[in-house]
Curated annotation (Swiss-Prot):
Keywords: Cell membrane, Lipid biosynthesis, Lipid metabolism, Magnesium, Membrane, Phospholipid biosynthesis, Phospholipid metabolism, Transferase, Transmembrane, Transmembrane helix. The gene is carS. The lineage of its organism: Archaea, Methanobacteriati, Methanobacteriota, Methanomada group, Methanobacteria. This is CDP-archaeol synthase. It is a multi-pass membrane protein. Its EC number is 2.7.7.67.
């Protein structure tokens, strides 16, 4: 696979993770995932920023996006890229079920990664909303890649591309969310 195709495939594969991560901000609110509990260091386990509603709705949104990508592939839209993923999932057939599975893994992986990132930030004594470069951009990426790697092979080149692209996409998305008043900070 040439480098340009690999870049496009990497972005295509991550669409459910990217959209799930962003949608948690829209769907979020309600009960914090840590239920307000504190850790051994007398700081919140995760904090108010990661909620059950945002995590569940965002994860399901990622799954739906994966299903939509699978459905579009049945009509030839993005089918080249979807076939690369689908050909590796041998225990189930059909683009839509395969898309739902990949979307589920990427979507929930992204949001669990975000929760892990929040946990780490609290342990490192960073307050909610304070920037922690690279952790802020990559927590959701790393865990979503771990989850999806259970069904899809990821080359080292692909992982590097996803990490690099994700850093810039994440910063751009945060700036946009800040401009439309969905976030209090631009980073």
């Amino acid at each position: 696979m040439d480098i340009l195709t690999l870049i496009f495939y990497s972005i295509y594969l991550m669409i459910p993770a990217y959209l799930a991560n962003g949608s948690a901000l829209v769907f979020g609110g309600g009960t914090p995932m840590d239920f307000g509990h504190y850790c051994w260091d007398n700081r919140r386990l995760i904090g108010n920023g990661v909620t059950w509603r945002g995590t569940v709705c965002g994860g399901l949104f990622g799954m739906v996006i994966g299903g939509i990508l699978g459905l579009l592939a049945t009509y030839g839209i993005g089918s080249y890229f979807f076939n690369i993923t689908a050909s590796q999932i041998t225990f189930m057939s059909g683009f839509v079920p395969q898309g739902l599975l990949v979307g589920f893994l990427l979507g929930f992986g992204a949001l669990i990664g975000d929760a892990i990132g929040s946990f780490l930030k609290r342990r490192l004594n960073f307050e909610r909303g304070k920037p922690v470069p690279l952790l802020d951009q990559l927590d959701f990426v790393v865990v979503s890649l771990l989850f999806v790697s259970t069904v899809v092979s990821l080359s080292l080149e692909m992982i590097v591309i996803i990490i690099l692209v994700s850093i810039f996409l994440h910063l751009g998305a945060n700036m946009f969310a800040y401009m439309i008043n969905l976030k209090d900070v631009w980073y």
